[in-house]
Amino acid sequence: MFTGTIFNSLFTLPLVISQFVPPPTRPVDLWDPFKTTTTPFPHGGVNQGLNRDEVVVRLPLGDIVGKEVHLHNLPWTIHKDPTEELPKDGTHFDPNPLKPKNNITVFTFLGVPYAEPPTSQRRFKPPQQLTVFPGKQPYLAFNYAASCAQDVEKSPSPFVDHPYPFMVDEDCLYLNIFSPDISKNAQTTYPVIVFFHGGNFQTGSANEWPAHGLASRGMVVVTVNYRLGAFGFMSMGDSETGNYGLQDQRLALEFVKNNIVTFGGDPQAVTVVGHDAGAASIGFHMQSPYSRHLFRSAATMSGAEVSYHSYIGKTALAFNNTMKLGRYAGCTQAVAQHRWDCILTRSTGDIIDATRNIPIEYNRYLFMPTVDGKYLPGNPLWTLVNAPSGETSIMSPVPMLIGMNAQDGSEVVLEDRRLGEFSQFNDVDHEYLKSYSLEYCYRHNYSMNREATADAILSKYTFWPDRAAAWAIKENFIQFATDAYYTAPMQLSSHLHSSSGSRVFQYVNNYNFSRQHPNLLFIPDWMGVCRDCDLYLMFGYPFLPDELRPIGLRGINFTDTDRNASRTFSNIIRRFSYHQNPNFQFDGSWAAYEPRRHWYINFNYTHEEDWKIPGTLARDYRYQDVAFWNEYIPALVNYMTTTFSPENVAYRREIMVFKWITGVNVIIIALLIVLAGAFGYMVWGNKEDEEAAYKAENHQLVEYRDTGHSVSDATISSRTRSPRSRITNL
């Protein structure tokens, strides 16, 4: 019995120990074992001091130097938010309330490499892990690195005449770190936000989203560059090529897991936040076996992995797009591998120019994530649909925050650069709506009832009281693009994830920024709640000085209402990163999304006191319109012009097969008849020709009168006979 007790203890001891694993701690600095300074000396073997606003941390890759940035007059601190002082009963307030204005220091490390440069022999290949920081030590992380190579003219922006503010290069695998505290004597670590930017996998950059304001809320924020377009997703249709951009993101997550504790972050408390293509990327990582255990929660904004426009489901299409790129880049080799090798010799500009000139037949773009059977094991929609039955599995069914902006589709208008250059995006008329509807159907390969499908879309989004009303046409076009590209996929993703094991919280941002004169330059009246408006709120730009805002937002006059909305929305992200639940501690009214109860928060603030609650709880956001795209349009596409009742589907197939066989038989019989006629003509026609020719010879035989003469003495016509005639007469 005693032996059995020891035996049981040996097997239960590891389980007991695992329950008391200590939280991650910051590494001990051999230059400063007693944690008396943030700056280790000497670094790089040189006894060199730092400027007052510079800080250095030590990683296994080498020393890295960043900067301090001071933010002033903020209504929160890194440890407390004003909403946390509001008790549920409304009577017992915090005895140590926050001051109305607080100063916070954020530590920034910009342009930090997380992989070897994907150039030269590493071009169009999976990213390789970095072993040491490049260049002279320590590594100076003071400025943003280059954005990934892209066609900057495709970027949806109201500033069509403004040059792109960052350099672009294929050497672009860098990230930016914003931390509220890197002191080695800190007693705690902070949750981590890893942000993947949007741009439909074609454009965008982490550099466009400075995160000082979000980091000041008590989170370590990491913004990531990843390869785009052909450079990130060109594929031969196999499991060895393509999806480089997704693999870049995964390697960045591994970098965070291995190093973020040095910057004050908790590697076990990582929340991935993605916008547009970044949101779809998160859905792909949740399904990929290669991204397991790299994050504990996810927030997807204005994008979904189930959208037709987020991935290429057929490897043959990915292969064909690559071959087209080769042809347009001047590579005409007949062997596919040789053409691929030729593309690798083309410059960055050559590839961008060739991609721009290729007509797109299917989907919105040529190069996107591909279902390769490896990194993306299966079709994302099919995987989610079959997950509840156990036929497929979601590798990372983490808690999710899913949301969008009310007019996300405005980016489709902004993407049309010609529309902006020639008419300031004003020439959206009925013909524009009609042509776009038909083009939408062509891109979706709606070969059945293509025109009927386009007519259904046009009918739904036509303003029938006045078909010529310009304001109504543009408004309806934006709603069409919003529903098709954002609302319907978001609702479908929420439904499937909530059915597959994830706890889902949904929001819709209906907050309109103030519209004074300077603001109209970056958010015109017609745009409504723009595609990036929730990011402006989340990153806290209304609280930042001009020099720390994105270039397009400098000079904007944000109001107190704007700041109030930003404070509340960023606190939603803060609560979710800390607790995987966006509810405030005194208010649990934000109900989770359910498959049959589609709860969401309508985020719309017009009064300053409204910041006390996260929004208005509602149900079934635009569900009638969602059904149009997710149910009616697919059914209409599959509807045959000549149809039978549903119960006779098998009989209909037999009829179709019979028609095909009958048609083929008729064609064969007709061919046989034609061949027989031709053969008969050759046989009988030649004989008739010979007889006619013989008669035409005008032969005259003389009556035989002398029995002493032979037939050769007979008198023959004076006309000369042909050799053939002689043979015949003999």
Curated annotation (Swiss-Prot):
Primary localization class, coarse: membrane
GO BP term, example: cellular response to paraquat
Glycan attachment residues as annotated in the record: 103, 320, 445, 512, 557, 564, 604
Membrane topology: Single-pass type I membrane protein
Gene3D superfamilies: alpha/beta hydrolase
Transmembrane intervals: 664-684
InterPro entries noted in UniProt: AB_hydrolase_fold (IPR029058), CarbesteraseB (IPR002018), Carboxylesterase_B_CS (IPR019819), Neuroligin/BSAL (IPR051093)
Spans within the Cytoplasmic topological domain: 685-730
Matching SUPFAM superfamilies: alpha/beta-Hydrolases
GO cellular component, as recorded: plasma membrane
Pfam families, alphabetized: COesterase (PF00135)
Keywords: Cell membrane, Glycoprotein, Membrane, Signal, Transmembrane, Transmembrane helix
Known role: Probable neuronal cell surface protein thought to be involved in cell-cell-interactions. Confers protection against oxidative stress. Plays a role in protecting dopaminergic neurons against oxidative stress-induced neurodegeneration.
Protein name: Neuroligin-like protein glit-1
Organism: Caenorhabditis elegans
